[in-house]
Design a protein with these regions (language model features):
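Interfacial segments of multi-pass membrane proteins
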Residues: 108-125
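Hydrophobic alpha-helical segments embedded in the membrane of multi-pass proteins
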Residues: 82-88, 109-113
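Canonical alpha-helical transmembrane segment with a positive-inside/aromatic-interface signature
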Residues: 127-178
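C-terminal ends of transmembrane helices
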Residues: 27-39, 90-103
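Internal alpha-helical transmembrane segments of multi-pass membrane proteins
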Residues: 73-78, 82, 103-104
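Alpha-helical transmembrane segments of multi-pass membrane proteins
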Residues: 26-29, 52-60, 86-94, 136-144
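Alpha-helical transmembrane segments and their membrane-interface boundaries
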Residues: 1-77, 126, 164-178
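Membrane-water interface at transmembrane helix exits
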Residues: 33-34, 60-67, 93, 97, ...
Length: 178
């Protein structure tokens, strides 16, 4: 029992709260995606935000243990850059082309933003993380109505980039030409 008490006493509750906040905020965005029936929903968004927060917390811990290497400081920034790159690959997996439509770009963008929310939470920037979550939720839950009515003519009358993609000439395989 003493060991368990010592274990809880040694926990870094500030860092744990950062992880919990990231999971909660990522879950809020994921809930909207889940409710909308999107490919990446509650669990995916929660895990992306939590993972980004964990890597941010690890970055802080690494900096505390290894403050500099050859007089260079900046572990924090390298990990953040790699989080963003990694999330780009996950997001790319949600983008699909169906018939003449490209789907999943909003979900890919929401995963990218959720990773930023996780990074902000991991570094303890709660105000920024919460404010961003609120704005993202409003964009996802409310702007689709505006988009639906403002872009109806563009979509259904064949104008815009999607029409350009649909009518563009497929790429030729230059390797087969002699």
């Amino acid at each position: 029992m003493v060991q368990l008490t010592q274990f809880f006493a040694s926990l870094d509750w500030e860092m744990i709260s950062r992880l919990l906040v990231a999971a909660l905020l990522g879950g809020a965005v994921g809930f909207e995606r889940e409710r909308s029936g999107k490919v990446a929903g509650l669990r995916t968004h929660t895990l992306v935000s939590l993972g980004a927060a964990l890597l941010s917390v690890i970055s802080i811990k690494l900096f505390q243990v290894f403050p500099s290497v050859n007089g260079t400081v900046g572990y924090d920034y390298h990990l953040i850059a790699n989080i963003v790159v990694g999330i780009g690959f996950i997001g790319a997996g949600t983008i699909l082309r169906r018939d003449n439509r490209i789907e999943g770009t909003t979900t890919a963008a929401s995963l990218w933003v959720v990773s930023a929310i996780g990074i902000a939470s991991g570094f303890g920037f709660y105000q920024e993380a919460v404010a961003t979550t609120v704005v993202v939720y409003v964009v996802l839950a409310g702007l689709w109505l505006v988009e639906k009515y403002l872009t109806r003519d563009i979509r259904y009358k064949g104008r815009g980039i999607f029409n350009e993609l649909k009518n563009s000439e497929p790429h030729k395989d230059l390797s087969s030409e002699k």
